[in-house]
UniProtKB/Swiss-Prot annotation:
Name recorded for this polypeptide: Polyribonucleotide nucleotidyltransferase
GO terms of biological process kind: mRNA catabolic process
GO-annotated cellular components: cytosol
Summary of the function given for this chain in its UniProt record: Involved in mRNA degradation. Catalyzes the phosphorolysis of single-stranded polyribonucleotides processively in the 3'- to 5'-direction.
InterPro entries tied to this protein: ExoRNase_PH_dom1, ExoRNase_PH_dom2, ExoRNase_PH_dom2_sf, KH_dom, KH_dom_type_1, KH_dom_type_1_sf, NA-bd_OB-fold, PNPase
Domain KH span(s) in chain numbering: 565-625
A GO term, aspect molecular function: magnesium ion binding
Similarity comment: family membership: Belongs to the polyribonucleotide nucleotidyltransferase family.
Signal peptide interval: none
């Protein structure tokens, strides 16, 4: 393929696309330049057909540290497993692309985005999304319509397309939108209690820019005109599907309408598969008739796939035509809510939130700021003091499964809940703790990420974290008939509705506005009118859940748990930091040892955080540090400890060195008239009262020994 270069025009940002130069053994390769950000996207698909009921699409986003001129900090000094940002970006691109693939295409596809150079103000995520879409467009893969993504910020009531890092820091809205030139396909956002109307306006604003990027890609596609893979479903397979549907339609419908539709559908599927196993398959090999294992296996796979299609068709039909949900709820009805706090006595805060058959147990741990998470990627190193971890064990869905490292899904769900809560957390100066929340999903039947939001909010308030407001979340679903444009919006979708539906819109927020949002589609875009209705329906449900939560706990507790560490922050002059640390950490280690292992964190700006489980120990440590950094003054009296005696080179006694506190020492001179022999009057380790009489130009201090009954000013 000859090298071809294309560049956007009449856009805020300039994208340059190079095709035909790099990685030429793949089905499609794109090098995207976005100012100094460079991303290589490669796409490969398997020619081997699969008998699956889903698309085995894998999207990988990987950052090479040389892209930012950095050497990896790991022991091996090379990139290792994907970090959270890489995983989340991979999911972001996957969720944007997946709705655009036709149902008939089920061959394995792998799209890899490698960041080769990074300018932090020009996001590699956008370049990766453009490269992923374009590589699919110019390949044989049946991907027919371009998608693009943009970021939107909001500063001083004005929307900004693809804001810089500095602009994002001042923005009340962090919105990522992906879509085609016709519709939106994916939304991801977190915000500072932004209203539904502002969100909708921002999405519409983003889509105007998306259209231009999609047209840019389609113009490139026309120059390549790739031959696309077509539908290979044969007439015999269509006939087989029709016969299966006719035979089992009434049984499936009855199972869906039962009181326990999930279990009844599973039992019916197993019953039908058992019947399919009885079907004999034989083949002839060298005049001998033998059992055809491969044909038998394919028959079972086909039967299971057809059952899934039929149950999906019948569930959708009931919702669309008869407005009947599998569990008989109304379209806007929320499942039964239950919540309680303080389940775990030794955790610093805990809560259990149950919505129908979905249940989250959240536990809060408070720690010192030095326990915050260090994020070291392509951008500058950052400290993250709030973490929310989501665990989805196999028993939550009644299954046997492997326990491994957190999956991409678990990381994604945890991050969404983390974004929702982080908007209402107190500032570090007001609550100087590292906060970790863990959500254990004990039961799951849809919307477990939003149950996590609710449980986490309750647990944080119970732990004494002064949240600005309570946060709740809920998922809204959609069933859309593309032939008739009929649709039904469902509040608080359960697992079956999520599986057969066309949208999963998760919205979390307070009673004032939205703090986090995520939308995934299974159809090729959603009309703006439907999106508007879904937002309003989600708000109604969220307010209902917040009202329920307020009956369990309405305000954050005024104090942290008795098992949580107590912390005090003090501000000192940065030049005084060395007085606390001492040479080689000598002084700070002495403080820690003499104060029951107290934790002390010192920031470069002079903030000192003292933490211990006992409040009195914290107060004593703070008082001691204050004495360390005090400016010694002439004429002021102090308590001092005798450290040693000094003699001159001839061995003649000069005086005694007294220490007010580590780092502040002075001389009690032998010439003071009261001394006959200083060693008879003073003993090493003895505490005496002294008065500062002189500080010379070199900072050396002279003390006057006071009578024992003198009341010192400072102790």
């Amino acid at each position: 393929m000859l090298k071809k270069v294309f560049e956007t025009t009449n856009l805020k940002d300039s994208f340059q696309v190079e095709i035909g130069t790099y990685a030429r053994n793949v089905d499609a390769s794109i090098l995207v330049r976005y100012q100094d950000t460079v991303v290589l996207t490669t796409t490969v698909f398997s020619r081997k057909p699969n008998n699956l009921d889903f698309l085995p699409l894998t999207v990988i986003y990987q950052e090479k540290l040389y892209a930012a001129g950095k050497i990896p900090g790991s022991f091996l000094r090379r990139e290792g497993r994907s970090n959270d940002h890489e995983i989340l970006t991979s999911r972001l691109i996957d969720r944007s692309l997946r709705p655009l693939f036709p149902d008939y295409f089920q061959q394995e596809v792998q799209v890899i985005n490698t960041v080769l150079s990074l300018d932090p103000d020009f996001k590699s995520e956008l370049a990766s999304m453009l490269g992923s879409s374009l590589s699919l467009l110019i390949s044989e893969i049946p991907f027919f319509e371009a998608i693009s993504g943009v970021y939107v910020g909001k500063i001083n009531d004005k929307f900004i397309i693809n804001p810089t890092l500095q602009q994002l820091a001042n923005s009340t809205l962090h919105l990522m939108v992906a879509g085609t030139k016709h519709n939106v396909t994916m939304i991801e956002a977190h915000a500072n209690e932004v209203s539904e109307q502002d969100f909708l306006e921002a999405i519409n604003f983003a889509h105007q820019y998306i259209k231009k990027l999609c047209l840019f890609q389609e113009n490139i596609k026309q120059q390549f005109a790739p031959a696309k893979i077509t539908n290979t479903l044969h007439q015999t397979e269509q006939t087989q599907q029709q016969a299966f549907f006719a035979k089992h339609q009434s049984q499936v419908k009855q199972a869906i309408l039962s009181c326990n539709s999930k279990n009844d559908l599973q039992q019916l599927k197993e019953q039908i598969l058992d019947q399919a196993k009885q079907t004999p398959f034989f083949k002839t090999i060298d005049t001998a008739t033998v059992f055809d294992y491969e044909a038998h296996k394919k028959h079972l796979q086909t039967t299971e796939t057809l059952f899934q299609k039929l149950s999906k068709q019948e569930t959708r039909s009931l919702i669309l035509q008869e407005k009947i949900r599998p569990d008989k709820r109304g379209l806007e009805e929320i499942r039964t809510l239950e919540s309680q706090i303080d389940l775990l006595p030794r955790a610093h805060g805990s809560a259990l939130f149950t919505r129908g058959q979905t249940q989250s147990l959240a536990a809060v741990t408070l720690g010192c700021l030095s326990e915050s998470k260090i994020i070291d990627g392509l951008s500058d190193e950052q400290n993250k003091r709030f973490m929310l971890h989501y665990n989805f064990p196999p028993f939550s869905v009644g299954a046997v499964g492997r326990y491994t490292a957190p999956s991409r899904r678990e990381i994604g769900h945890g991050t969404l809940a983390e974004k929702a809560i982080s908007q209402v957390l107190p500032e570090e100066k007001d609550f100087p703790y590292t906060i970790r929340v863990v959500s254990e999903i004990l039961e799951s039947n849809g919307s477990s990420s939003q149950a996590t939001v609710c449980a986490s909010s309750l647990a944080l308030m119970a732990s004494g974290v002064p949240l600005k407001k309570a946060v709740a979340g809920m998922s809204v679903g959609l069933v859309f008939d593309q032939a008739t444009n009929k649709y039904v919006i469902l509040s608080d979708i359960q697992g079956l509705e999520d599986h057969v539906g066309d949208m999963d819109l998760k919205i979390a927020g307070t009673n004032k506005g939205i703090t986090a949002l995520q939308m995934d589609l299974k159809i090729q875009g959603i009309h703006f009118k439907i999106l508007q209705e879904a937002f309003l329906q989600a708000k109604k449900g969220r307010l209902h859940i917040l009202e329920h939560m307020s009956q369990t706990i309405s305000q954050p507790r005024l104090e942290v748990s008795k098992y949580a560490p107590k912390v005090c922050m003090m501000q000192i002059k940065p030049e005084k930091i060395r007085d606390i640390i001492g040479s080689g950490g000598k002084i700070i280690n002495q403080i820690i040892e003499s104060h029951d292992g107290v934790k002390i964190d010192i920031e470069q700006d002079g903030r000192v955080f003292v933490m211990h489980s006992n409040l009195e120990t914290v107060k004593k440590t703070v008082a001691f540090i204050e004495s360390l950094i005090q400016e010694i003054q002439i004429g002021t009296c102090y308590q001092a400890s005798i450290l040693r005696f000094l003699s001159d080179k001839q061995g003649k006694m000069i005086g005694a060195v007294a220490q007010v506190c580590p780092g502040i020492e002075g001389l009690i001179h032998v010439n003071q008239k009261k001394f006959q022999k200083i060693t008879d009057v003073l003993k090493i380790g003895e505490t005496v009262s002294v008065k500062c009489t002189k500080i010379n130009d070199r900072g050396r201090i002279d003390f006057l020994l006071l009578p024992k009954n003198t009341q010192e000013k400072n102790s």
